[in-house]
């Protein structure tokens, strides 16, 4: 039986889809059977980051409309045979997918994979509600910024209201030099504010951007890099391993940004 995990963020532009692609491939390299489901109807980008955009013939909407079999819409990654990609829709047509439909598709697939990772749309609208409907676990991706953390707080509330209580945190694009200068939230600050278990910390890096632009997620590179190692370690923690975190958070001080974000979160709308 699959572990069905939705990867979400609330705010767009935090690297959620990049995180999904790298964690998916990292899990596959760790001998797990992984399905990456792009649930961002109309604005899909996971295919580009995986370098699979030219191999898409059918998608989930085609399956639902009876135009193809489910197996025809699944794309096996030739670089990593344990990884399968499933686009829910095309960029050309933004048609609604219902909660019942995504649930039916996942039900047909869940016995064939160890992990199903669902790349959720940014925001908290209907697309988000559909993406989280079939999930049993959630990973919230944030950057150490005011807006990202405030939106993540809202998303966590929505997930809990849906009954998803197994929620983990990934802090992305951390810049240690800014943390030391007290111009960015530290790992400890973000953990304390959001109050959910930390499962990954990924530093900001041009290597991630370059790899994404090539359609080759960083974890595919045989050369060891700090962000690549961070993604792999995150995948290992998802599998239940006790993996020590890279120490990015060596500065302890009273950061004024921490107080600011705490106040913002307290003022945010809690009526989910």
Curated annotation (Swiss-Prot):
Q: Which SUPFAM superfamilies does the record cross-reference, listed alphabetically?
A: P-loop containing nucleoside triphosphate hydrolases
**Highest taxon listed in the record's lineage:** Eukaryota
- Gene Ontology annotations for the cellular component aspect, listed alphabetically: chloroplast; cytoplasmic side of plasma membrane; cytosol
Q: Which Pfam families match?
A: CbiA
Instruction: Provide the protein's localization.
Output: Plastid, Chloroplast
Where along the chain is ATP bound?
11-18
Which terms does the UniProt entry file under GO BP? Answer: cell division; negative regulation of cell division
What Gene Ontology molecular-function terms does this entry list? Answer: ATP binding; ATP hydrolysis activity
Q: Which InterPro entries match?
A: CobQ/CobB/MinD/ParA_Nub-bd_dom, MinD, MinD_FleN, P-loop_NTPase, ParA/MinD_ATPase
Which UniProt keywords are listed?
Answer: ATP-binding, Cell cycle, Cell division, Chloroplast, Nucleotide-binding, Plastid, Septation
PANTHER family in alphabetical order: SEPTUM SITE-DETERMINING PROTEIN MIND HOMOLOG, CHLOROPLASTIC, SEPTUM SITE-DETERMINING PROTEIN MIND HOMOLOG, CHLOROPLASTIC-RELATED
Q: What does this protein do?
A: ATPase required for the correct placement of the division site.
Record's family? Belongs to the ParA family. MinD subfamily.
Tell me the NCBIfam families matching this sequence: minD_bact
What is this protein identified as?
Putative septum site-determining protein MinD
Which source organism?
Answer: Emiliania huxleyi (Coccolithophore)
């Amino acid at each position: 039986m699959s572990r069905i995990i939705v990867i979400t963020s609330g705010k767009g532009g935090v690297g959620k889809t990049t995180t999904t692609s790298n964690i998916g491939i990292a899990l596959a390299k760790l001998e797990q059977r992984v399905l990456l489901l792009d649930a961002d109807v109309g604005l899909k980008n996971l295919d580009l980051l995986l370098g699979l955009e030219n191999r898409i013939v059918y998608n989930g909407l085609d399956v639902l409309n009876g135009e193809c079999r489910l197996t025809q819409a699944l794309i096996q990654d030739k670089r990593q045979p344990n990884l399968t990609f499933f686009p829910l829709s095309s960029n050309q047509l933004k048609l609604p997918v219902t909660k019942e439909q995504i649930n039916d598709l996942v039900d047909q697939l869940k016995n064939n994979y160890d992990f199903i990772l669902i790349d959720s749309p940014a925001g908290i609208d209907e697309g988000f509600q559909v993406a989280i409907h079939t999930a049993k676990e959630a990973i919230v991706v944030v950057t150490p910024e005011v807006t990202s953390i405030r939106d993540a707080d809202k998303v966590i509330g929505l997930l809990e209201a849906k009954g998803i209580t197994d929620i983990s945190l990934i802090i992305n694009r951390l810049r240690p030099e800014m943390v030391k200068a007290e111009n960015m939230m530290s790992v400890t600050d973000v953990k304390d504010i959001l109050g959910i278990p930390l499962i990954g910390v990924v530093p900001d890096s041009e290597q991630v951007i370059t790899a994404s632009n090539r359609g080759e997620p960083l974890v595919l590179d045989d050369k060891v890099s700090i962000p690549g190692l961070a993604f792999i370690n995150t995948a290992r923690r998802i599998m239940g391993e006790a993996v020590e975190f890279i120490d990015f958070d060596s500065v302890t001080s009273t950061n004024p940004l921490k107080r600011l974000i705490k106040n913002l979160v307290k003022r945010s709308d809690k009526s989910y």
